[in-house]
Amino acid sequence: MAHPHLLAERISRLSSSLEKGLYERSHAIRLCLLAALSGESVFLLGPPGIAKSLIARRLKFAFQNARAFEYLMTRFSTPEEVFGPLSIQALKDEGRYERLTSGYLPEAEIVFLDEIWKAGPAILNTLLTAINERQFRNGAHVEKIPMRLLVAASNELPEADSSLEALYDRMLIRLWLDKVQDKANFRSMLTSQQDENDNPVPDALQVTDEEYERWQKEIGEITLPDHVFELIFMLRLQLDKLPDAPYVSDRRWKKAIRLLQASAFFSGRSAVAPVDLILLKDCLWYDAQSLNLIQQQIDVLMTGHAWQQQGMLTRLGAIVQRHLQLQQQQSDKTALTVIRLGGIFSRRQQYQLPVNVTASTLTLLLQKPLKLHDMEVVHISFERSALEQWLSKGGEIRGKLNGIGFAQKLNLEVDSAQHLVVRDVSLQGSTLALPGSSAEGLPGEIKQQLEELESDWRKQHALFSEQQKCLFIPGDWLGRIEASLQDVGAQIHQAQQC
């Protein structure tokens, strides 16, 4: 076997050659190439005139000496037009019912069948055997067929509960194509002088028969790690819970796993990685509604679980909660104690701030969070002058909740221990405390836990950075995963600054 990274580079260059002159069809070419290299079938859905047949023709050039067969189905198509005419000579001389298959589907490596759902039962039944077993019954004997890729196309989906569903289920990869959208690409397409039938692939990049056969065995040796299987099973369970989710047969799941193995193999890896699971978005949908649903569920899986994003956020939440508990315990020791002034004959007890409290704005921590003015509050900012006046003369006192917005009216009092206590509408109280010294930093317990969490985050990010070098995964999906990991990293960093 060639060095894995050299193989990945070769397949990337092969795909680039196949994509030349085809605009906004890179993803379709790459998945069709992956299907061809792993012996799977593809269904292309889209309106006429969007290069569906050209995609199939291009794939012929991925292989040395590959033969192609393409046919436009109609309601009147006969098996002879797809599988070859009957041999009159064999029937006449020997009484044998045998087809002349040269130039037809049974002898082609690349097959393109347009308007596939118009095929009659006789064609469909033979086609199912060809896809499932790679065999063709020709008269009294069974012939092995060399088909590596079947591309079926239509501008419509098969009718539900029809005889076509069995064939549709065999189409592992399903791609929904549309017209060229980008203005620059549209102009380039209009003005291109390239002959679409020219071979764009250098001989050195084409796949030989020996390589293809060897790769089929090596694809099967790619492992499925436990954590990747758990992600697949999580997706399956989630789909089973959704009433509008499409039915996915065990056969389709099994074939999809082989496609993931092929993705890993041709990306230079020895095991399936979470990033390969994005391919399932093109394997599990049935119609327009399920296409969106499948993409949403896989997006949740990739941005929330595949690299432990949600698990790390849950751990972070527990660490932050523990830090709050420690701060509240510390606030008992650092509760702000005001000084009682003399004047026993005064109608109102007067207080003043300690002499060491000199800041013009005071930020005081709540021993326990309270809901004040419809906000969960953990600290209050007071103007020192306003607090001093309230301690001396009483009246109304206002403070900024969590240090933001306008100062809000507060229910504040001094308790018997000469501590400031703020109360909510239900008169639940929370003692106000001076924040700890910034030099103290995070408690050792919290600091260690955050460092361990940051280390785990770095490992997950490094794994993703290594795995994302996958030709078959669109860049926008990789961008969303990167953003989800960066968000987790930012939240960890923010907690470390507290």
Swiss-Prot record:
Q: Which UniProt keywords apply?
A: ATP-binding, Chaperone, Cytoplasm, Hydrolase, Nucleotide-binding
Q: Name one Pfam family in it.
A: LARA_dom
**Anything known on activity regulation?**
ATPase activity is stimulated by ViaA.
Q: What is the enzyme's main class? A: hydrolase
Q: Where, by residue number, does ADP bind?
A: 23, 49-54, 196
Query: Which reactions does this protein catalyse?
Result: ATP + H2O = ADP + phosphate + H(+)
Q: What coarse category fits the chief subcellular location reported for this protein?
A: cytoplasm
Q: What does this protein do?
A: Component of the RavA-ViaA chaperone complex, which may act on the membrane to optimize the function of some of the respiratory chains. RavA functions as an ATPase.
This chain's protein is named: Regulatory ATPase RavA
Q: What species is given as this protein's source?
A: Shigella sonnei (strain Ss046)
